Amino acid sequence: MSLGFWNCATTRTSDFVVSVKTEPDGTSWFSLNSDGSRGDLIKINGGGYRMPSSPETLREKVVDEYGNIRSEEQGYMQGADVFNFVIREIPRDIKRLAEWSGEDLQGLDYYVFHQANNFINTYLAKKLRLDAERIPSTIAKFGN
């Protein structure tokens, strides 16, 4: 069985795409990318090494022009920018990994995407011309 696993993430210091393609004999192909320019798209300011947990980091306050209330220890994501990153970068990276590994994407038995949301996974399937039946999904049952 041939599997393709894809995930992407943004950290405080870098964006990265992780793609893995595994052969039946255990051979794996990885694509790891990082540039750091969008490191603030998903963030949690407090509770870590740079800003240790304290009463101040736990205190909730209005933090943006929309009146959202959160503490420094609650996560924040710039959803539209993350979405644009995913739909621009992930298909390109998946195609590049398939080329490097010598695999036709249509030849994989299953495609395993990060279960962030169904819209993105459906978009990726269409963009890459993949059979949706070979993309397992747990989003409806478990969410992200």
Where are these regions (language model features)?
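Short, flexible active-site loop motifs that bind/organize anionic cofactors or intermediates
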Residues: 80, 98, 125
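A short glycine/serine-rich beta->alpha loop
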Residues: 2-6, 77, 81, 139-143
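Glycine-rich helix-loop-beta junction characteristic of Rossmann-like nucleotide cofactor-binding loops
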Residues: 100-103
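Claisen-condensing/thiolase-fold acyl-transfer catalytic domains that form or cleave C-C bonds
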Residues: 1, 87-95, 105-144
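Glycine- and other small-residue-rich loops at beta-strand/loop junctions that grip anionic moieties
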Residues: 6, 31, 113
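Condensing-enzyme catalytic core mediating Claisen C-C bond formation in acyl metabolism
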Residues: 9-88, 92
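A glycine- and small-aliphatic-rich helix-loop capping segment at beta-alpha/alpha-beta transitions
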Residues: 5-10, 128-130
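Active-site histidine-anchored catalytic micro-motif
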Residues: 1-2, 17
